[in-house]
Curated annotation (Swiss-Prot):
It catalyses: (6R)-10-formyltetrahydrofolate + 5-amino-1-(5-phospho-beta-D-ribosyl)imidazole-4-carboxamide = 5-formamido-1-(5-phospho-D-ribosyl)imidazole-4-carboxamide + (6S)-5,6,7,8-tetrahydrofolate; IMP + H2O = 5-formamido-1-(5-phospho-D-ribosyl)imidazole-4-carboxamide. This is Bifunctional purine biosynthesis protein PurH. It comes from Shewanella woodyi (strain ATCC 51908 / MS32). Pathway: Purine metabolism; IMP biosynthesis via de novo pathway; 5-formamido-1-(5-phospho-D-ribosyl)imidazole-4-carboxamide from 5-amino-1-(5-phospho-D-ribosyl)imidazole-4-carboxamide (10-formyl THF route): step 1/1; Purine metabolism; IMP biosynthesis via de novo pathway; IMP from 5-formamido-1-(5-phospho-D-ribosyl)imidazole-4-carboxamide: step 1/1. The lineage of its organism: Bacteria, Pseudomonadati, Pseudomonadota, Gammaproteobacteria, Alteromonadales. NCBIfam families: PRK00881.1 (NF002049), purH (TIGR00355). One of its GO terms (molecular function) is phosphoribosylaminoimidazolecarboxamide formyltransferase activity.
Length: 535
């Protein structure tokens, strides 16, 4: 095996000790000499594993409270030496080859995430020697093996056992990629953290006090690392290539973390639409169903159970529901699953959990993509990204949602209790409809959805048309608008359609005129003070 390289000497130095003792014992059993530092060396020695301190190997002690341990020619020369080329130099400088390095880095992310972390705390958790060894070993992957993830220990041991104590070039190259990904992510975290510390140009003798009292939410340069989950057949259109990347630091229930139980591979559009459906259904605590088509909800309802919620959501717009995405906020049962597959063609069904009986029902439609995303307790604070040509827009996720005690009735007429319940339901749906968004609802069920029109009044007209097409009664329905009404024409159109009350953010320079129009029609109007544009 021409590219095999034997492991005779290894350097182990890890902050996360998971699996390192077992790994060291396995290396020792194969005759590998072990070098180590600090806590890792003590752990091995305390458990009877022969180990040589790096300071003994180099003949130079650790200095500066451990800041300098492995930054030495006998370490990096041993790692970077090209086998078959640098032997004479190594002999002249008494450098011994180091064939394997297992390193993970100081816990910078965990440190800065702690409440009360100071800049000094962060600085002391910036690893220097570790990344240097990682990069050196990865650079020389032709001859040396680098491990930065504990889950690779068993893989390397198995390969050594199968190859007379050696690793293959294929494995070393794959591990080198992981190593460069690891150091890139690590440096990115550090750059992001420091980039939020904006100097106040103070002459204060204390460096830490010379930083602004409040950090900037957005660093000077933004670094992130996404991991490819899958290659996609094509992108939004068949002439576009695509792949799906995920943020491994987010553990919130999402399309990115969902497990596919059956069906064809998810497409680009499937993933985007499933995200829209799932994020919408998360807003509801009662059994709810959201049906999405082209990133817009076309039917949303709550019910006593999922079957009722699905039947009511489907009733809103059966035509658009064809080939749609269906999301639930509770365990999918067999009865609801049967109603779906018997009634309509569906691309994706996603729920926190899917019972075995429901799986068996959906299995009859082998192409249907069935996803289980897990329960969601809390939403993760994270950023939204929007790509523009030559740049990237970053913002907080829109996680805002007003409660009953936060809205303000601005009309003369007060909404009834039933109307207020429908208003809050309708407002949650409007948040996930493309702007300009108008949603009609009655009895916790959408009646019509007007999405993406350039004029708000035309979105209202579309919602009315959709309701009429399906024979749904608009009279005494409620209406939600994702942003304020600039003119009274939207109110007049709503009144003509039979809308009884409206929920909207308010904030127009013509608010008084808008409120007067509502009063003129005997409508109730509620302001939320919060807009939900969605583009």
């Amino acid at each position: 095996m021409n590219n095999a390289r034997p492991i005779r000497r290894a350097l182990l130095s890890v902050s996360d000790k998971t699996g390192i003792l077992e790994f060291a014992k396995s290396l020792h059993a194969q005759g590998v000499e072990l070098l180590s530092t600090g806590g890792t060396a003590r752990l091995l020695a305390d458990n009877g594993v022969p180990v040589i301190e790096v300071s003994d190997h180099t003949g130079h002690p650790e200095i500066m409270d451990g800041r300098v341990k492995t930054l030495h020619p006998k370490v990096h020369g041993g790692i970077l030496a090209r086998r078959g080329i640098d032997e004479l130099v190594m002999e002249q400088n008494n450098i011994k080859p180091i064939d394997l390095v297992a390193v993970n880095l100081y816990p910078f992310a965990e440190t800065v995430a702690k409440e009360g972390c100071t800049l000094a705390d962060a600085v002391e958790n910036i690893d220097i020697g570790g990344p240097t060894m990682v990069r050196s070993t990865a650079k020389n992957h032709k001859d040396t093996t680098i491990i930065v993830n504990a889950h690779d220990y068993d893989r390397v041991i198995a390969e050594m056992e199968a190859n007379q104590g050696s690793t293959t070039l294929e494995t070393r190259f794959d591990l080198a990629i992981a190593a460069f990904e690891h150091t890139a992510a690590y440096d990115g975290m550090i750059a992001n953290y420091f980039g939020t510390k904006v100097p106040a140009h103070s002459q204060d003798e204390c460096h830490e006090r010379s930083l602004c009292a409040e950090d900037s939410k957005f660093p000077r340069t933004y670094n992130t690392q996404l991991v490819k989950k899958q290659d996609l057949r094509y992108g939004e259109n068949s002439h576009q290539t695509a792949a799906f990347y995920v943020d491994t630091n987010i553990d919130e229930a999402s399309v990115a973390t969902a497990v596919q139980l059956q069906g064809k591979a998810l497409s680009y559009n499937n993933i985007a639409d499933t995200d829209s459906a799932l994020e919408c259904v998360k807003e509801f605590s009662e059994p709810a169903c959201v049906i999405v088509k082209h990133a817009n909800p076309c039917g949303v309802a709550i019910g006593e159970n999922l079957l009722e919620a699905y039947n009511r959501a489907f009733q809103t717009d059966p035509t658009s529901a064809f080939g749609g995405i269906i999301a639930f906020n509770a365990e999918l049962d067999a009865e609801t699953a049967a109603a779906i597959v018997e009634r309509q063609f569906v691309e994706v069904i996603i729920a926190p959990k899917v019972c075995q009986a429901a799986r068996d029902v959906v299995a009859a439609k082998a192409n249907v993509r069935l996803l289980e995303c897990g329960e969601w307790a809390n939403k993760t604070t994270s950023l939204d990204y929007k790509r523009v040509n030559g740049g990237l827009l970053l913002q907080d996720r829109d996680q805002g949602m007003v409660g009953l005690d936060e809205v303000k009735v601005v009309s003369k007429r007060q909404p009834t209790e039933a109307e207020m319940k429908d208003l809050m339901f309708c407002w949650k749906v409007a948040k996930f409809v493309k702007s300009n968004a108008i949603v009609y609802a009655k009895n916790s069920m959408t009646i019509g959805v007007g999405a993406g029109q350039m004029s708000r009044v035309y979105s209202a007209k579309v919602a009315g048309i959709k309701a009429a097409d399906e024979g749904l009664e608009v009279q005494d329905s409620v209406m939600a608008s994702d942003a304020f009404f600039p003119f009274r024409d939207g109110i007049d159109a709503a009144a003509a359609a039979g809308i009884s009350c409206i929920i909207q953010p308010g904030g127009s320079i013509r608010d008084e005129e808008i409120i007067a129009a509502a009063d003129e029609h005997g409508m109730a109007m509620v302001f939320t003070g919060m807009r939900h544009f969605r583009h």
